[in-house]
C-alpha cells in the first residue's frame, strides 16, 4: 500500500508559532486592504480605526465586518486591491437575486489556493498514484477548478468531468476507476442511484474517498453515504468570497469537523444578532479574515454559516464543527426556527425512505404549512404498510423534536428533481401566494 502524502510543516506547528504567524500576516492584510482598496479605506475610516492600531489578534474585533452586500455594491471589481493587470482569474457566484458576487485572484492567490486544496486532499487520505474524479461544476463556480488544480498540485491524476450527465459519470467511474471523488453530497447520492439503476452495487466501485462540500450535510448523511458507497466521506469547506473550496477540510483519521487552515484564514465566531465575538466552543456565525490574499482581501467576512470553533485534533489548527445550517437558510414556521439539516437528520432515521427530500412552505389562510416531499428507498423496496409507518413516524418526530407539524408526502422514486450542484432543499411559496 502506498504511504500517505506528507504534511506541510505548518500543520504541526505549535499554537504559539501559529499565532505569531497569524499576527504578522494579519497586519499585512489589513494594511494591504486599507492602502489599496478604496472601499476598505472608507469602511475603516468610518469606523474610526486604522490598521496600525492592531497590536494583538484580539484587536481584530475592533474592525468593521464585510458582507456579501459590500461585494455586490462594489460590483464588479470595486473591492479589488491590485491593478487589473495583476488579476489572473475571475470567479463569480450567482446567488439567488441581483448581480453576481465577483472575486479575483492574482497568480500568487491561485498558487496558494492550489496548495490549500492539495493540503485538504492529503488530509482526506490521498496516496501517490490516486486518481481524482472531479464532479464539481467548472466555469465561474469555484468548485471545479479549485478541486482540479489542488489535485494536480498534490501530484494526483485528475479526471475533470464536471457536473451533470450522471449516466456518463457512472460509465467513467467504472472504466477509469478513480480512487477519490470530489462532489456535492446530494449529487453523490444521485450517482449512487444511477449505479444501482444499472445493477451495480455502489460499494463495489473503485472509489475509496469522497470529499464533499458546497452544501451543508449532516453526520447521518455521512454515515448513509459511507455505508452505501463503501468509502470514507470527509467534509471540505469553502466559499468563493473567501477563496473557494479548501478554506478548511476534515482529516480522515478523525472525521470530527473541518480543520481550518489558520495560516491563511483567521476565524471568529460572533453572535449573529449583536456582532459580539463569542468564545471558542459557543455556537454562532462564522467570520473569516484572509491573511495572504492579494487581489481581494477579505476582512471579517460574515459567512452566515452557523458553527462553533473547536480545539485541534489531528492538526494543531482549530476545527469548526460541521455546519448545521446558515442563518439565512433558517425557516421560520409558525414562529419556530427550523433548519433543513434538522429535518434531514430525522429523515435518515427512516430506512424505508431515501435521503432525497424537498421542503415546500405555503400558506393556508394566515397559517404556515410545511410540506415535506420524500421518496421510497429503492434498496429496501418497502411495501405500502412500511411506507405508511415511515411517513407517520417521520411526521411524529418532526413535531416532537422540532416543534412544527409537517405534511409528509411520499413521491415515487425519482419524483424529486435531482440537482447536479447544490440541492434545492427549500421552496418557499409563502410570499408569492402560490
Task: Please give the residue ranges for each predicted region.
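Generic structural signal for residues in well-ordered beta-strands
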Residues: 158, 233, 267, 357-359, ...
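AMP-binding/adenylate-forming catalytic core of the ANL superfamily
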Residues: 181, 287, 291-402, 421
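Active-site phosphate/ATP/adenylate-binding loop shared across adenylate-forming ligases
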Residues: 2-8, 63-234, 242, 246-252, ...
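Nucleotide 5′-phosphate-binding alpha/beta core
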Residues: 1-92, 97-115, 119-123, 127, ...
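Conserved AMP-binding/adenylate-forming
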Residues: 208, 217-312
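Short, flexible turn/loop "capping" segments at secondary-structure junctions
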Residues: 10, 203, 259, 322-326
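Conserved beta-strand termini and adjacent loop/short-helix elements that scaffold enzyme active sites
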Residues: 161, 236-238, 270, 362, ...
